[in-house]
Amino acid sequence: MKLIIAEKPSVAKSIASALGASSRADGFYEGNDLLVSWCVGHLVSPMDAGGYDEHFKKWRYDDLPILPEPFRYVLAPGKEDTFENLRALMNRPDVDTIVNACDAGREGELIFRLVYEMAGCRKPVLRLWISSMEDSAIREGFSDLRPGADYEALYQSALCRQKADWLVGINATRLFSVLYHRTLNVGRVQTPTLAMLAERDAKITLFHKEKYHLLRLTLDGAEAVSEKFTDPAEAEQAAAMCKGAAVTCTSVTREQKKEQPPKLYDLTTLQREANRLFGYTAKQTLDYAQSLYEKKLLTYPRTDSRYLTSDMAETASCVIHLAAKLPPFDGCSNFFPLVETMISDKDVSDHHAIIPTMEIEKVDIKALPLGERNLFLMVCCKLLCASAEPYVYEAVTATFDCGGHSFTAKGKCILSEGWREIDRIFRASLKEKPADGDGGTLPDFTEGQTFDGAEVAVTEHFTQPPKPYTEDTLLSAMENAGKDNIPDEAERKGLGTPATRAAIIEKLVAAGFVERKGKNLIPTKAGINLVTVLPEPLTSPMLTAEWEQKLTEIAKGGADPDIFMDGIRTMVQEIVSTYSCISEDGKKLFAPEKEVIGTCPRCGQPVYEGKKNFACSDRSCGFVLWKNDRFWTSRRKELTKKIATDLLKKGRTNVKGMWSEKKQATYDAAVILDDTGGKYINFKLEFPKRKVSSDGRK
């Protein structure tokens, strides 16, 4: 009997249904000589430093670096029952083979292997490797199970990734947190990503905009533009020379251009476009795609390929025709799909591009949640576009002379809309404008053609700063980090993997190093300060991209895991030995920002709120309002920020409900600041005057 272990319950249910294991028991499905059970994500994790030695539970510089060998592992809190269920199933006498059906990728391999090792299982392992949750794909994959040993290199790559993250994260986080007296989360991939955000923010801050001018020449049905003028007087002088002058068309060039269909989606391009069109975060897009995968509507989402394999040509053709029947695509012109343009066996490693499945003909798309529906239609649109004809147009450039100055007008004439028709119809359904082009149609200008009485206007413009990163542009930057320093034949470049980049962004936001402002991702002051104090090995996108490339080489059997880990350990040791102390100014970088609540009545410096007082920022001044001053505690009133603010601003404040010990009752009065310049501040009470009645009584 085979025991199949999936990564999550929903996947196990689909596998069990497809393979005929229809009987549900406690923690597994059974039937057809199969048992199907599940993990719940990472059941087994590396032990925290404190687990190796009680001494490590407290963060101290003298304990660093912490370099465990061998690494130890523990069960994730709250998942003990799930693990014990799997161990019991593995140990059943009638189970002779274990099938690893966790996600077909690096992390899925790690999740299964760590459970298998901790359970002490030694039974043979086979690997289910599929890219779709369709019943047919599951059955086909099950008929072609591979020996688990074929994926040993992938497992070693996953282990190296996990150990490297632990070593860098634990040691660097403890080191800089101890030095700066604040928890500073440092990560092997998240910190270089933060560095890119900080660098872009600095460029925006330091950008100096420059003014320039353009001359705009109005012609029959078109507008031609001059070169830039940096001197406004020169621009006005040129405009004066052109106004009313004759205009001559000096050249007209026409060039037929062809824009090939876009490639299919991998996860990163799907996340980027979903951010542009709908504002979805990378994590939201991954969650929607994962849900659609588990509903059998999309293929495996965590892929870095944008092509299909040759054996998928027939299936792809069928899916294309099904997608073309869905609104809004059913309004497109008839076209014959060019499936061969999407096929490239050499560009598919673990998983092919993301496409819809044959299940779409069985599902009511309108019944899907909005986010999933939008994403699903995006993938359908991309499949149709990728298999359509090229977009063909004629690019027209006309140049003109007026008053001795040259002007240029650009336009285009569409010859065949091709794939852009599908894209245009989809965007129209979203009320989105089509992608920008290079101008509209130009009149039929001819060389030597002349125009009388030129109309010229001077327009003012400014150079623009770099734009803040959005999730779209940050994902692109992460994907391409280190690209120029890694050989072209390398399979993976960049920071992280398609499957991990969303989580990296979320960690930076959760740690308070990055904040979302609309679609923009902006580093916080703490984030910028962190990048400032960290050494280059921890902030360099290029170095981290090279590490990611090494992990890929390990997964392919082309690099030694031990050499990789030795390099990580050496780097950690060097960082710890280099950073043993910091300057006094450095200690202030992560001090919490204090709110100014008023001005000191003695010296005029700002007054800040502290834990126990409201004190002048100039310590030599000595002005302090103590929160536990007996004046307030005896009257059972709290010296609040509002009361302190009023006292500093007006010298007095009205306070209600003060307690009188003598009368055993509350009363209202004005409290007046009575500062005599001594060590302690005095206060006076002023009671409202009672009104005198007409008979003289109060």
Protein language model annotation of sequence segments:
Residues 71, 93, 135-219, 254-258:
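C-terminal or mid-to-C-terminal helical accessory/interaction module adjacent to the motor/catalytic core
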Residues 9-16, 33-36, 40, 76-87, ...:
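Amphipathic alpha-helical transducer elements in NTP-driven molecular machines
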Residues 232-265, 271:
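Metal- or metallocofactor-binding catalytic centers and their adjacent structured scaffolds
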Residues 1, 101-104, 181-183, 254-263, ...:
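Conserved short loop/turn motifs at secondary-structure junctions
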Residues 30-32, 218-222, 401-405, 663:
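Short strand-coil-strand connectors
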Residues 1-162, 166, 337, 465:
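Intrinsically disordered, low-complexity regulatory segments
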Residues 2-3, 79, 90, 173, ...:
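Basic, low-complexity terminal or inter-domain segments flanking catalytic cores
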